[in-house]
């Protein structure tokens, strides 16, 4: 995972591998979303890592959007925000 700071937060380049198959994803995380989802209890990278774990438990890597804002996950999985806060904040 590569992290690039942006004016509003961070941009993450995430590569998922399984065997020889790989998928690449670009995820944006605003400071506001980071604060709301993690409460500052972990680094932004950990929020993205746990978010991908959440997604991979529900769909194959090929189904994950190639580019998205982290808040979009809750549009497809309404329990995302509650679950990710529970994982991160305990």
Residue spans for each PLM region:
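N-terminal intrinsically disordered, cationic/polar leader segments
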Residues: 1-42, 63, 70-90
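A short beta-strand-loop micro-motif that forms or neighbors metal/cofactor-
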Residues: 45-46
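Basic nucleic-acid-binding interfaces
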Residues: 49
């Amino acid at each position: 995972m590569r992290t690039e700071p942006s004016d509003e937060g961070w941009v993450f380049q995430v590569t998922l591998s399984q065997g020889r198959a790989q998928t690449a994803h670009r995820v944006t995380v605003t400071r506001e979303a980071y604060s709301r989802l993690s409460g500052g209890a972990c680094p932004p990278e950990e929020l993205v890592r746990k978010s991908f774990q959440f997604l991979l438990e529900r769909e194959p890597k090929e189904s994950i959007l190639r580019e998205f804002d982290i808040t979009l996950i809750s549009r497809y999985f309404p329990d995302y925000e509650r679950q990710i806060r529970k994982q991160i904040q305990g």
